[in-house]
A protein has these predicted regions:
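N-terminal Lys/Arg-rich, disordered targeting/topogenic segments
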Residues: 1-15
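Exposed beta-sheet edge and beta->alpha loop/turn motif
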Residues: 11-15, 26, 30, 41, ...
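Short, low-complexity N-terminal intrinsically disordered segments enriched in polar/charged residues
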Residues: 34-91, 95
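Short solvent-exposed beta->alpha transition segments
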Residues: 84, 98-147, 236-239, 243-249
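Hydrophobic pocket/interface hotspot
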Residues: 89, 100-102, 216
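Short structured motifs
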Residues: 133-135, 198-204, 252-257
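Asparagine-centered strand-capping/turn motif at beta-strand->loop junctions
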Residues: 217-223
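Short, hydrophobic/aromatic beta-strand segments
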Residues: 224-233, 249-250, 283
Length: 316
């Protein structure tokens, strides 16, 4: 005991110093542990908030900030503005608010796809939503057009099947309105070409993801009935671009009677052409290679293979 007291008296300062160091280290460790727990709790809270936000925005996910076609980056401000309006539309649909969803559509989209709100409800809303909530992903396709993949919400339905995923293409128009159901846009053209006393005017083009519809007016100022096309050849009418690429018409959607134009008559016609939507495609003309300038004469021709068809080029 005496030796222990003697050791303590001789090393009292050192012992106190060691004790203070141990206490200091202990306090530091406690503080570090405390702040680590706070940081971890904050991360958990942020994660929960992110999940909640995702659920409130219908589980929407932006795939990338780059165009799927060109690979070019999209400006963050544009991306936010565009996805906000798409999210708004999807939110209306998820909540069964058909009226407000319909009001986000452009007038052109309404006219071409859904003339009435009932048409929109029956054709689009009931087909994709039908009272159910949906999850979806958004990916820029090209410029103002976005690919939206719509999937049954597993949290709402309790199941997820492969055949429950649908894809739509939604295009943002300048006034923050939408073209949906793969309808891209309307292009006003108003270009006319006259030849052989026949005038063809291209009024406008309705552009879809897989095809285009040209609205044209034909004025026949001749003394004979003309036939725009014999409609027996899938390649007799086509669009020609600056690289001499041809895009052929859907001849099965036209009937011969619509292609007949009496003398001094004017008629309106819509012709559908093949097209996988590309923003930079430059169409220069529409070509009719089997136009008949005198239909009565053509009818009397026994060997129609020898008939001298006229090629009419409409400049665009």
């Amino acid at each position: 005991m005496y030796k222990l007291m003697r050791f303590y008296n001789r090393n009292r300062k050192k012992i106190f110093r060691i004790i203070l160091i141990i206490v200091f280290i202990f306090v530091i460790l406690k503080l570090l542990n405390y702040f680590t727990k706070i940081k971890a709790n904050k991360k958990i809270e942020e994660t929960v908030n992110n999940i909640d936000n995702a659920l409130t925005t219908n589980n929407s996910t932006l795939i990338s900030d780059k165009s799927s076609i060109s690979g070019a980056s999209i400006q963050s401000s544009k991306l936010k503005k565009d996805t906000d309006i798409i999210n708004q539309f999807m939110d209306y649909c998820n909540n069964g608010d058909v009226s407000n969803a319909y009001n986000l559509l452009t007038d052109d989209c309404k006219k071409e796809m859904f003339p009435t709100i009932q048409d929109f409800s029956n054709i689009y809303y009931s087909s994709l939503f039908n009272g159910e909530r949906k999850s979806y992903t958004i990916e820029n396709w090209e410029n103002d057009t976005y690919s939206v993949r719509i999937t049954s919400d597993i949290l709402s339905t309790g199941s997820l099947k492969g055949d429950e995923t649908r894809q739509d293409y939604i295009t943002i128009i300048e006034n923050s309105k939408l073209n949906i159901n793969s309808y891209v846009k309307k292009l006003n053209v108003n270009k006319k070409t006259s030849d052989k006393n026949i005038t063809i005017t291209v009024n406008y083009i309705n552009v879809y993801m897989d095809y285009e519809i040209y609205d044209i007016t034909i004025q026949n100022n001749t003394n004979d009935t003309i036939l725009l096309d014999t409609n027996d050849d899938t390649k007799s009418v086509y669009l020609l671009d600056k690289n001499n690429m041809k895009y052929y018409f859907y001849n099965n959607e036209l009937i011969k009677e619509k292609l007949l134009i009496q003398s001094n008559f004017k008629t309106n016609l819509q012709i559908k052409f093949d097209n996988s939507y590309k923003e930079k495609r430059n169409i220069e003309s529409m070509i009719f290679t089997k136009m008949i300038l005198n239909y009565n004469e053509y009818k009397d021709e026994k060997d129609k293979d020898k008939y001298n068809y006229y090629t009419f080029k409409v400049n665009l």
